Regions:
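N-terminal low-structure segments adjacent to metalloprotease catalytic domains
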Residues: 1-66
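Short pre-active-site segment immediately N-terminal to the catalytic Zn-binding motif
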Residues: 128-143
Length: 291
């Protein structure tokens, strides 16, 4: 990133593409590939066309926080935990990219509080952040949250079909990932853009439960991330606050783990419907899903 900041304006797009190139394999299914500079923008990456002192300060904060080494150490710790339990899942070699976010993007800064990350494709993790004190404090937890997703959807784990996958799978996946992060890093593991009010709200939980059987990942945004994200990406709001799916997923997964005497690490490949069938009645809810 520092090279991009120092480069002439006409050189920056190519450098952004170079920065993202190790992640190009995420888009192997797209005929002809994708423009990785566009992926940078879609992931709330900093605006290389309008560099400001604030962006330079953001990069410096990440450097001062030893962000890259901390994330690497956290991922190594997490991988070692999974390898020790011999889960039967192939733990992939990881390509990981930490990128500074765009401080002028109101949704990124206010709604999701400086964090956009993705680890759902085996072997690849992207983390876009704005280095607030809260984000910097959570770097390790953010990384292992994405690692849990990555291992869940690696060979030998859960098969993700974007056309048939359910909201329930995504909700449970987020709950498992947050619980895994808390197993390693305590309360820092909980995704910080989910408010305590949302986490403890029974009406939010009931509302999310009503959408669990919806299929197709194109329909997930409102149910998992909430109405604000749905509106941003052109999806239909359903009446849920930001992070509703995370909040519901955490409650459901916690109930399941307590009943099963298991951990999020041990349950990395547990089917979502199995978790929901056990957890829902414990929370006074009904789940009618099918395998």
């Amino acid at each position: 990133m520092s090279r991009i900041l120092r480069a002439a304006p006409d050189e920056r797009p190519a450098l952004v593409r170079d920065m993202w190139f190790p992640l190009a394999g995420m888009y192997h299914f797209v005929p002809g590939g994708v423009d990785m500079s566009a992926i940078h923008r879609q992931n709330f990456g900093f605006d290389w066309e309008n560099l400001t002192p604030l962006i330079e300060e953001g990069v410096e904060k990440l450097i001062e926080a030893n962000a890259w080494n901390r994330i690497s150490d956290a991922l190594q710790r997490g991988v070692a935990q999974f390898e020790a339990i011999n889960s039967g899942i192939d733990v992939p070699d990881l390509q990981v990219l930490l990128v500074l976010g765009d401080p002028t993007n109101k949704h990124f800064m206010n709604e999701i509080q400086g964090l956009s990350a993705f680890g759902g494709i085996s072997g690849f993790i992207t983390i876009t952040v704005w280095p607030t004190s809260q984000v910097l404090d959570r770097l390790e937890a953010i990384a292992v949250h994405e690692l849990h997703h990555n291992i869940r959807y690696s060979p030998g784990g859960v098969v993700w079909d974007p056309m048939t996958v359910t909201v329930g799978e995504q909700v449970i996946s987020e709950g498992l990932a947050d619980e895994f992060a808390t197993e390693l890093y305590g309360d820092r593991g909980y995704t910080h853009f989910v408010s305590e009010k949302c986490r403890d709200n029974d009406e939010v939980l009931k509302k999310v439960m009503a959408g669990l059987s919806i299929t197709g990942m194109q329909n997930f945004t409102a149910w998992v991330h909430g109405d604000a994200s749905a509106r941003l990406f052109g999806a239909e709001p359903v009446g849920l606050p930001t992070g509703a799916g995370y909040a519901a997923g955490t409650r459901l997964v916690r109930a399941y783990l307590q009943a099963a005497g298991s951990t999020a690490m041990q349950s990395v490949a547990a089917p979502a419907n199995e978790i929901l069938r056990i957890a829902a009645p414990l929370l006074g809810l009904r789940f009618d899903g099918e395998d």
